[in-house]
Amino acid sequence: MRVEKGTLHIRDGLTHYPQEREDYRFFKGDLDLPPRIVTVDCSGGLSFDVLAWLAEQGVTLICLDWKGDGVSVLACNGYAADPVKVRWQQETRADSAARLAFAADLIGRKIAISLTTLEQHIPPSRLQTIAIEKSRIGIDRLANEKFADLNAVFAIEGECASAYFAAWQGLAISWKGTKRHPVPDGWQIYKGRSSLANGVKPENRNASHPVNALLNYAYAVTLQRLQIQAIADGYDPTLGVMHSGKRGNPAFILDLIEPERPRIDALILAFVAKHTFSGADFVIRDNGGCRLSPQLAKHVAAIIDGRPQRS
């Protein structure tokens, strides 16, 4: 990023291979001048000329780390977010009826996309039929019922999610080279979304099955992308409408990712259906949880980003 002949010249960094680097040039007073510029995981330095140019044109510079968390903000008014958008977040969350309507619509869209994933990526079975029926009922209830609180919305979501992942049970995973890289017997088929590495209480985190590890990683990649985009768009990532969170947690990003989850599921299901894995693709940790190898993680990130991978 530098000033050349009175213009701001920005050149993309290298994030993956192969990649064509793009150049951007902005003129003072340009109608297309962005209100904020976001850099992600950058190194190097900025000249005082660049800082002065940004300040003069009222452009906010936001520096994020690779996770999408803020590192620094350079803003003329000391505030990086868009006041109008943040006010909408605050007012929608504070208004009980508006918050419920937001949540019902969000979860309704999530279940509708889940229905498509069930129909297109899960083989016909009794459990698939049950999940499809529950999804249709859930969509109808969310569109037509009046809810007293968020717990009623979450109850519908939970019932549909339970049936949704139950329909995945029995999905086969293909393996190669198991003599050289043996895998646990429990990895031959998919049994459920909960992790055995979490003890008595079933939870989705700390995956103990490869499919769940793939899902968790894909969700994390998407969460990072959504957080960066939300910040670039001027929202406060910590101010959730449906979700609440501890200070600093990206509650609004947890809102945004809800309808994206079943889309991610579809991508992972399609990948699992056509890919033959090796035991070397996963690392088993001391507590029984499994993690993706760096090479597989790179491949999954490319799938989520819609980038073709070289074989």
What do these predicted ranges mean?
Residues 1-31:
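N- or domain-start disorder-to-order transition segments that initiate the globular core
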Residues 20-27, 43-46, 54, 145-147, ...:
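Short, exposed beta-strand "edge-strand" segments with a Pro/Gly-rich flavor and a Y/T-containing core
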Residues 24-27, 34-37, 42-116:
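A surface-exposed, charged beta-strand/loop segment in the N-terminal or early-internal portion
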Residues 31, 43-47, 249, 260-261:
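Generic structural signal for well-ordered secondary structure
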